[in-house]
Amino acid sequence: MTDDASHADDSRPDAGVARRRVLQAGAAAGAALTWGAATGTAHAAEEARAAGSASAHPAPCRPGAPGSASWFSAPPAPVRPKFRWWWPDGLVEPAEIRREIDQIADAGFGGVEIAAVHHSVDDPAVLDTARHGWGSASWVAGMEAALEQADRRGLTVDLTAGPAWPTAVPTITPDSPAAVQELAYGVAALAAGARYEGPVPAPVVAADPAAAKATLLAVQAVRVDTANSTRKETGLDPATLVDLTRTVTNGAVTWTAPDDGGSWLLFAHWLRGTGQTPEAGPHTAPTAYVVDHFSPAGTRAITDFWESDLLTRPVRRLIARAGGALFEDSIELESRALLWTPALPAEFARRRGYDLLPYLPALLLNKSNQVYAYGAALTVRVRHDFWQTVSELYNTHHVTAIKKWASTFGLKLRAQPYGLQTDAIATAALLDIPEGESLGFKNLDDYRCLAGGRDMAGSTILSCESGAYTGGAYSTTWQKFLRTMGGAYAAGVNQTVIHGFSYAALPGVAWPGYAAFTPYHGGVGYGESWGPRHPTWRHIADMSGYLARVHQVLQAGKPRQDVAIFRQTGYTATGIGASWFTSTGIPLGWNHQFISEPLLSLPSARVTNGVLAAGGPAYRALFVEADFFAGSTCTLPVEVAEKFLAFTKAGLPIVLLGDWSTATVPGLDTGGQDARLRAVLAQLLAQPRVRQITDKTAVGAALADLGVTPLVSYATSSTLLNAHRYADGVDYFYFCNGKHAETVKPPVAAVDHEVTLRRGSTRHVPYLLDLWTGRVRRIGTYTENGDTVTLRVALQPGETMVVALGVPGLFGDRTGSGPHAVSTTADTVLFADGRLTVRGSADGEYVTELSQGRRTVRSRISGVPQPTQLTGWRLDVEDWQPGATATETRVVRRALTLDALAAWPDIPALADVSGIGRYRTTVRLGRAWTGGHGALLDLGTVYDTCRVTVNGHRLDPVDHINPVVDLGGWLRQGDNTIEVEVATTLGNRLRVSDPGVYGGSPRQPYGLVGPVRLLPYWEARIG
């Protein structure tokens, strides 16, 4: 940005802020800023430099060895966060695609995921799908440009399998065998003795207009049994079912109901296409229809289209160099009836051992609602078997087949394996990269389900579609993003795909450019369109650096977990947690993951030295409870119970909650399985390493009785979350003072208590890894007790930290195994320049006990200045306003003098301003300010992102959750200039520049709100 405007000289008091005097020094038009449209100018050089050099280590580089300083401080591109990159189908220009790749690379990100999404486009005429649709020549040209530029910049490109979601191709119709299908039903009611003669009943729910074909699968009659009715379902008697399919002639059936005094229903079951198209289409010409996700034909339709239309020779060559993963969004298959695939009856009989068709009435759906039921237990069992079969077909014919195909040209498969009643835990184990989402997941246990599948399979990455908020367009703050994601990382997430980055321009869009999800039906949309259009992009490399370091730690080595929770039904995105562990165990330091039956057939499912999957998550106990998704009944497959028996005989502790004496298999008992199960369970419960309890409050005591304690334990119950990884002899512990769900009551409060960590060797010492700055230092105060280390953790809500336990000398540390403090009355004891140092913020004598010989050292500190609240600020504002085009920003410069800090909406001149503000003040320090003196700068409340400069020196990135900065040695005797640069969202400006969409949004309290305090400290060497 350049400032070619002159500043006015007028100054006047503004009475709009009570108890504050705001002097407006000037306001004038500034330079125009454009960031992306191929028809516009390049992003201003000043902003490009700001994004490219924003953090201490912003750019991807060659990875250092694990345990080295550079390994943590400067993670390489493959570890760095990615953007979901939304294109308006193929209406893109290769030059603009290359420019946006550069913007993302310069900002310190490691990759993109290309998706054809345009929910904000209400007028389909804007997009000529014949010329610019997904899969068109222009789409392929965009792919080639993205891959080519990504290769140059060291990024990876993920490719979505179809336009928007779910996966669809334009080479099929709803009547094609490869299209997603449903089983619809027609029904006629008959009284006892009544005769039906005529066409078989037509479906009660009309087909999609595009689905012209319907095939009759079966015709059945069954008597109503009100004893089996529920509040929403009509009860039926399965023993009375009559199969009339063979009696159908020319589409008609004749049948007389028994004259038994009952009411009868005549069902016709019709197989037809759902006609589902991908979200917010059309995206192609001809129209793309969603494929059958449960058959080889559906998968073949995907692979055939890619092979013929997308995988050109240049694309194949570039994928080999810059390709990342093929991506599929959540399984949002929509049906007015029951999802189906033609081979389902035969596959069901082969896999479950009995005929599915007699049980169809208990499976039928009408607009997602169950309509009929047999007896409660029978209905639950049959529905379990149905969805288990569907899950297996999805995993076999869709996930496994696509994964194998994608690998042939160099792509992994990343997918969100939820949305149906299928075993997402099992699917997560099959995928190269399973993915969850912050918008759709109810709480952290949803991530723990996918993490269990990932870790039992021996994979590394659990990805997350991150930071989408309903109504959050152009008002999403990075602080909110960080608070959301902090807990997800503790639950197993270690790859962030940010939602998202929109292509710059589209005809007819308003400033600040094309955004995939806003406006949404005329209102504020969801998700954010990050990029240079945002003022906070100036600080974006601080965010990418932080996220990259989180990933680096949480992708290191192997996970370490405490307990595996067995799930009979492997759903996720449900918010259903684990008894005791979710509510009580996690707040005490325990960690758990969920596993399901298919995971027990993996090579990792072995017990070694009493540990399950010792080479992976290393579960030290197994917990089994009733199936929440089957009416909280105690169910287990016989084969699973037998494996549990083998596990505990090999030494694995197992705790079972509930009455298992009457346990049943989850599916239909077709031959004495219930009796076999109970016999195996009787043996299991008699084992010495097994405990059965009936009260969930007794879980902790049962584990203690078995000698199982958490690897991380807290001195008190708290909101502290943790994740543990082990790599190359080093234990990494990630901590977050986080929330179990996005909205929790009461809100998370600050924590400050002792935490005890298990270490691999008594030689290991603790290091603090600063996720914001990339710096590492040995921790100065802790106690040791054999294989444990105890230290104090104090975190504000949402704040994070990483502790590593390893041999002396890691990360370039020079303190070796020298003595440390075990206790102190000072504010803190730290290693500074290799020497043990006590720090105090008030005059007095401080007593520190050292580890070596338990020696006590007294340190006297005097002359510490009092904390000072900083006032008298000059504020220079870049006011970002709509420019001449949708992608051009007009910058208006404003200069103000503030006697006291206030949020921008409370300053009349800034009430509707978005942009960047630079706050400057001067602090005079006396002659006593010499060696050993320093200060913390507590910024108080800042909205949204910020950076701090002292005497012209830009400091390390600020912790945006707890913005307290150590000014270290940058202060000097005399005058010191402190500058705080703050960047905002665009929400406040859009309220007035585009009121039809954003006018109802509340103003956000931008700026440096404070109070800003200088907190002096004195240091003294004690080592």
What are these regions (language model features)?
Residues 63-75, 80, 92-107, 111, ...:
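Mature extracytoplasmic enzyme cores
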Residues 19-24:
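N-terminal export leaders
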Residues 789-791, 919-921, 963-965:
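Short strand-edge motifs at loop-to-beta-strand transitions and within beta-strands
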Residues 1-17, 31-35:
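N-terminal secretory signal peptides
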